[in-house]
Regions:
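Bacterial signal peptide processing site
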Residues: 22-24
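Short, non-transmembrane alpha-helical segments in secretory-pathway proteins
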Residues: 28-61
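Bacterial N-terminal signal peptides that target proteins for export
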Residues: 1-9
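C-terminal partner/receptor-binding element of secreted or periplasmic proteins
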Residues: 106-137
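C-terminal motif of bacterial Sec signal peptides marking the signal peptidase cleavage site
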Residues: 18-20
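Extended hydrophobic/Leu-rich segments
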Residues: 6, 42-45, 77, 84, ...
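Mature extracytoplasmic domains of secretory-pathway proteins
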Residues: 49-100
Length: 137
C-alpha cells in the first residue's frame, strides 16, 4: 500500500512540475484596425499573419509589432521588434512595408544599420501604436 501511495505521489509531482513549467505567452492583438488598405492586417496580410503565428509559437522570445504612418504619403509601415531574454538581453528590429519587403534592420548582434537607411525609415513617420505583442511572465 505504501509503495502504491509513493508511486501515485511521484506521478502527481512530475505531472504538476511539467504543467507548471510550461510557459504560455500573454498575447495582445488589435484586430480592430485598418492599414495598408485592408481591415485587420494581422490576419489579412499573409506575411504579417505568418509573423504573428511564429511569435505565438516562439518559446524563447517576445515580439512587438507596431504600426507607423508616413505623414506625407499616408503609407503604413510596420516595426517588428523581437526580444530574447535567454541569452542575455538581445533585441532585433525590422521595418517592413505593406507587402512585407524589409526596409530596415537593426539590433544587438547585427551589423550596425546604415544611418541613411535608418533615417529614411523613420523620416516623417508617425507612431500609431502597438498592434500585436507576445509577452512571457
Amino acid at each position: 500500500m505504501k509503495r502504491i501511495f509513493l508511486q501515485t505521489i511521484s506521478v502527481v509531482f512530475v505531472v504538476t512540475a511539467v504543467v507548471s513549467c510550461t510557459r504560455k505567452p500573454t498575447i495582445y492583438a488589435n484586430h480592430d484596425i485598418t492599414a495598408c488598405g485592408v481591415k485587420d492586417p494581422l490576419v489579412n496580410l499573409p506575411w504579417l499573419a505568418e509573423e504573428c503565428e511564429k511569435a505565438k509559437k516562439a518559446k524563447n522570445g517576445e515580439t512587438t509589432i507596431s504600426l507607423l504612418q508616413d505623414t506625407v504619403t499616408k503609407d503604413n509601415v510596420f516595426k517588428l521588434m523581437y526580444y530574447y531574454k535567454n541569452k542575455g538581453d538581445i533585441y532585433i528590429i525590422y521595418g517592413y512595408n505593406c507587402s512585407g519587403k524589409e526596409l530596415y534592420r537593426s539590433g544587438l548582434g547585427l551589423t550596425p544599420p546604415d544611418s541613411e537607411i535608418e533615417e529614411e525609415f523613420y523620416k516623417n513617420k508617425k507612431y500609431l501604436g502597438i498592434i500585436f505583442t507576445t509577452k512571457y511572465k
